């Protein structure tokens, strides 16, 4: 018995010796912080000393929501003491920052180890190898600046969101043996006919070595958690990357109603020793355009959604916690969002939410606004760097369908168009598997039938993205919106056509939520009457904070009243209207149908969005919030435009509230069939 236990212990120790030695250690607590309103920190070399007059803060953090610092746009200093074990000397030690807005200098024990200039929203990494005192306490100092400078993107004050400075996202240390895997890129290719998927895996390592890779691929975010592949392979080295490929059978594709994911764990083996381990999620989907029409996994679809502007809650600003990010994602899904865009790069958690909950995203670099100068080499260089890092950081997210290179720039200026063209080409070079696009507000400046017609920069992308504000920012009769949209389509007939923004901005255009309702309804009616409109994005999910003047609020409360929720996530009446207009299924009637039965009349949406409703459930209840306590009726598949009649039990004397729920648990539509007898 002793020998049996002894050999079992030896096997266990051998097993643990082979487990990959990667630790991720959060470093978000007990940072010392001080603002530098006198701009003396650099000249007095604060980075060489322990900061004085500080307060303790936790990450993520921004000073612009603090009462005394709301209007400070300049330098802020952070410092943290970290004890580094002596046995880390031969390991790889990397400090990861989720984002620091907008420029930062990183010091270890008084010496500069990194800088990140003009890029306030991308995740970045600081290699600390050989720059630490091992077995001792080390001091990490971060000096960051959020002034309205010109050595950044967005340029100067050319942006419409808050200017919150600080270490606005979380930070962590990544510790592993060597060689170290710096990144993993998984490119899936779905073969619908064969129900199989090929994956190409590229691993970026800090050095080329004779290594083996142990691969495990598991179902993720699916009803089952099967291991679909477990294999050890020797990679091929191409351009400094370790490359491997596999073919998987019986694939469950990613779809916004069925966001099936796969998890890949790659262990780097050096001989018999596991030196590092890197993991990511990915998904198989085929998204393509055919003759201007959109297809997802072979299904003809149209898209509808809403955009959320991060930093909108004045209690958090850009320093949003995980719970706030997830809560905002849920609000998006509560209005049937399956399609969105972001004006600037978001926290990894946001894209993970979109992966798991089914939202297709256009992620953009924050190259924004008319004041961005054409032909500016500095701006273009920073934009290119941001684009590179954005693609590298978020390559594996199946929710990301497009890389966006700018919004509302001078879309007819030849120098600006040339820069946009180069950015789109770079996006396609970095990631040939996705679309690239530019969002325009100048498509209506002139059309194909104008003798002096010059194509807009939006034509350079894979599809047209048009910001449309007829009846508000556009000083035209609402009836003329039809003509404007038709003219744009006729000017670029070979391009799929999407509405990238529409909505009502207060206080510029007053009228409250009642006017917002009217604006939403008539714009949706216009888009849904156009067979060539492939999708639309409502702007915005919430009222959002901005540095722009023009509102009665001041400091951190300055805002655009633009949302179907307020800044804190409280719904307005327009929220339910957006949800109903964005539903893929319509409930049109509840009729008596024999003794004890009611008949529900349903149609698949022929507007926005359009897709097959598969796996949806129907409930009838007497209140809006208690439907899950009632019987669930499994609905048949409903195609766009298809009429479906469905019988349910009559529990409330011919009345009731019909709720239809998507496979992932979100309400698609909810309609009351209660009425007052005096109204009959």
Each model region followed by its residue ranges:
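Beta-strand-rich binding/interaction modules
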Residues: 106-108, 195-233, 597-633, 656-661
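Bacterial Sec-dependent N-terminal signal peptides
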Residues: 1-22
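Short, aromatic- and glycine-rich surface loops/edge beta-strands on solvent-exposed regions
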Residues: 139-142, 258-270, 653-666
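Extended substrate-binding grooves/exosites of carbohydrate-active enzymes
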Residues: 55-60, 66, 111, 117, ...
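Intrinsically disordered, low-complexity Pro/Gly/Ser/Thr-rich segments with frequent PxxP/GP/PP motifs
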Residues: 229-249, 627-652
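Accessory carbohydrate-binding/adhesion or oligomerization-edge regions at the termini
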Residues: 20-66, 139, 143, 147, ...
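Accessory beta-strand-rich segments of carbohydrate-active enzymes
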Residues: 29, 33-37, 69, 73-181, ...
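Extended acidic/polar, glycine-enriched regions
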Residues: 133-137, 202-288
């Amino acid at each position: 018995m002793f020998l049996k236990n002894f050999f079992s212990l030896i096997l266990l120790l051998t097993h643990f010796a082979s487990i990959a030695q990667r630790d991720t250690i959060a470093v978000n607590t007990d940072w010392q912080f001080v603002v530098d309103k006198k701009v003396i920190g650099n000249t007095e070399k604060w980075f060489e000393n322990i900061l004085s007059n500080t307060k303790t803060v936790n990450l993520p953090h921004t000073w612009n929501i603090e009462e005394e610092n709301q209007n400070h746009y300049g330098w802020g200093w952070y410092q943290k003491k970290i004890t580094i074990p002596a046995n880390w000397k031969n390991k790889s030690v990397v400090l990861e920052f989720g984002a620091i807005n907008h420029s930062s200098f990183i010091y270890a024990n008084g010496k500069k180890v990194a800088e990140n200039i003009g890029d306030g929203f991308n995740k970045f990494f600081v290699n600390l190898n050989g720059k630490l005192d091992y077995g001792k306490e080390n001091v990490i100092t971060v000096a960051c600046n959020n002034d309205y400078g010109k050595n950044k993107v967005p340029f100067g004050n050319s942006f419409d969101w808050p200017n919150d400075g600080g270490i606005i996202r979380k930070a962590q240390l990544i510790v592993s043996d060597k060689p170290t895997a710096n990144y993993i890129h998984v490119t899936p290719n779905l073969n619908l006919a064969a129900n199989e998927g090929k994956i190409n895996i590229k691993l970026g390592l800090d050095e080329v070595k004779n290594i083996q890779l142990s691969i495990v691929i598991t179902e993720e975010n699916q009803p089952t958690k099967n291991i679909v592949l477990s294999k050890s392979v020797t990679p091929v080295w191409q351009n400094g990357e370790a490359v491997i490929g596999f073919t998987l059978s019986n694939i469950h594709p990613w779809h916004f109603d069925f966001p099936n994911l796969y998890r890949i764990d790659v262990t780097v083996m050096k001989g018999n020793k596991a030196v590092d381990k890197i993991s990511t999620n990915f998904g198989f989907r085929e998204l393509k355009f055919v003759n201007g029409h959109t297809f997802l996994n072979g299904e003809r679809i149209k898209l509808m959604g809403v955009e959320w502007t991060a930093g909108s809650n004045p209690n958090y600003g850009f320093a949003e916690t995980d719970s706030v990010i997830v809560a905002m994602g849920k609000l998006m899904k509560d209005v049937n969002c399956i399609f969105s865009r972001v004006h600037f790069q978001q926290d990894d958690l946001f894209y993970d939410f979109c992966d798991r909950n089914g939202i297709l995203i256009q992620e953009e670099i924050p190259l924004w606004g008319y004041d961005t100068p054409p032909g500016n080499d500095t701006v273009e260089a920073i934009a290119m760097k941001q684009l590179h890092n954005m693609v590298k950081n978020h390559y594996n997210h199946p929710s990301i369908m497009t890389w966006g290179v700018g919004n509302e720039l001078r879309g007819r200026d030849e120098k600006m168009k040339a820069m946009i063209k180069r950015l789109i080409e770079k996006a396609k070079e970095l990631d040939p598997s996705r679309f690239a696009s530019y969002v325009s507000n100048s498509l209506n400046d002139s059309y194909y039938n104008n003798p002096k017609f010059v194509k807009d920069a939006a034509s350079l992308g894979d599809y047209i993205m048009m910001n449309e504000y007829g009846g508000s920012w556009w000083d035209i009769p609402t009836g003329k919106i039809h003509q404007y949209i038709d003219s744009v389509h006729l000017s670029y007939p070979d391009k799929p056509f999407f509405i990238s923004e529409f909505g009502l901005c207060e206080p510029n255009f007053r009228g409250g939520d009642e006017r917002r309702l009217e604006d939403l309804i008539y714009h949706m009616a216009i888009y849904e009457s156009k067979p060539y409109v492939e999708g639309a994005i409502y702007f915005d999910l919430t009222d959002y904070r901005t540095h722009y003047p023009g509102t009665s609020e001041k400091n951190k409360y300055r805002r655009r009243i633009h949302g179907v929720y307020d800044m804190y996530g409280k719904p307005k009446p327009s929220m339910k209207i957006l949800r109903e207009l964005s539903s893929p299924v319509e409930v049109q009637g509840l009729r008596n149908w024999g003794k004890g039965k009611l008949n529900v009349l349903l149609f698949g949406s022929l507007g926005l969005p359009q897709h097959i409703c598969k796996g949806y459930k129907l409930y009838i209840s007497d209140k809006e919030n208690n439907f899950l306590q009632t019987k669930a009726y499994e609905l048949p598949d409903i195609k766009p435009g298809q009429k479906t009649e469905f019988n349910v039990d009559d529990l409330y004397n011919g009345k009731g509230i019909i709720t239809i729920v998507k496979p992932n648990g979100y309400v698609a539509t909810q309609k009351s069939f209660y009425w007052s007898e005096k109204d009959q």
